[in-house]
């Protein structure tokens, strides 16, 4: 029997910025283009998943981002205790998607092969391509691999009935992962 999921968007951060800061190489039409930061909860009757882990207060301060609430607090607002989360899906390893290393102590992390290859490979030899990554996030994921807490996916994988991960055709780069819940009963913004 397949599950039906509710999708929650949990806003945890904000950055007042201009368009120049949103695009590699800048934007000649610079103007205000603020950015909000979200993690997602995919909540089923039988099982729930966290999609991306956000960043914590020290990382936000380092990168001059406003932390509106800690990710764990936002999850608790919808009834999810981070200590009991069993599955986390990481879309990609940018600092705002893969931080909070110890927030989910029991979780198994789902990650695309291509993403780990990208953030540990030759692309990181280029300073401009490293900007959205934090070495601590990458090494924390390597530690999770050695602790048998990472499940790698190569393209489309069903991780639960009606829930798949896949390599997205991303504007950022081809290695990003995208989850897709085929059956969503409702979508709520929190």
PLM features: residue spans?
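Basic/polar N-terminal segments that are highly enriched at the extreme N-terminus
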Residues: 1-4
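Core dinuclear metal-dependent hydrolase active-site scaffold
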Residues: 6-9, 39-43, 49, 152-183
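Conserved beta-strand hairpin/beta-sheet module of binuclear metal-dependent hydrolase folds
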Residues: 12-77, 177-190
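Active-site environment of divalent metal-dependent phosphoester hydrolases
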Residues: 16-18, 57-58, 93-99, 117, ...
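Active-site neighborhood of phospho(di)ester-bond hydrolases with catalytic His/Asp-centered motifs
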Residues: 50-53, 86-92, 110-112, 167-170, ...
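Active-site metal-binding motif and surrounding structural segment of the metallo-beta-lactamase
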Residues: 65-111
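Metallo-beta-lactamase
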Residues: 69, 74-80, 84, 114-167
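A short secondary-structure junction signal
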Residues: 100, 120-123, 176-178
């Amino acid at each position: 029997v397949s599950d039906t999921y509710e999708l929650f968007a949990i806003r945890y951060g904000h950055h007042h910025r201009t368009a120049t800061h949103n695009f590699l190489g800048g934007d000649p039409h610079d103007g205000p283009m603020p950015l909000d930061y979200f993690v997602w909860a995919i909540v089923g009757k039988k099982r729930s998943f966290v999609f991306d882990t956000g960043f914590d207060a020290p990382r936000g301060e380092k990168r001059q981002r406003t932390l509106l609430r800690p990710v764990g607090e936002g999850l608790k607002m919808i009834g999810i205790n981070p200590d009991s989360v069993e599955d986390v899906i990481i879309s990609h390893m940018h600092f705002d998607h893969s931080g909070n290393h110890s927030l989910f102590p029991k979780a198994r992390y789902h990650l695309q092969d291509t993403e780990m290859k990208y953030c540990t490979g030759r692309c990181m030899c280029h300073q401009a391509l490293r900007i959205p990554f934090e070495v601590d996030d990458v090494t924390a994921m390597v530690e999770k691999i050695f602790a048998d807490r990472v499940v790698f996916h190569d393209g489309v994988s069903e991780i639960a009935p009606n829930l798949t991960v896949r390599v997205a055709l991303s504007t950022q780069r081809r290695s990003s992962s995208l989850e897709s819940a085929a059956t969503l009963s409702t979508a709520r913004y929190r």
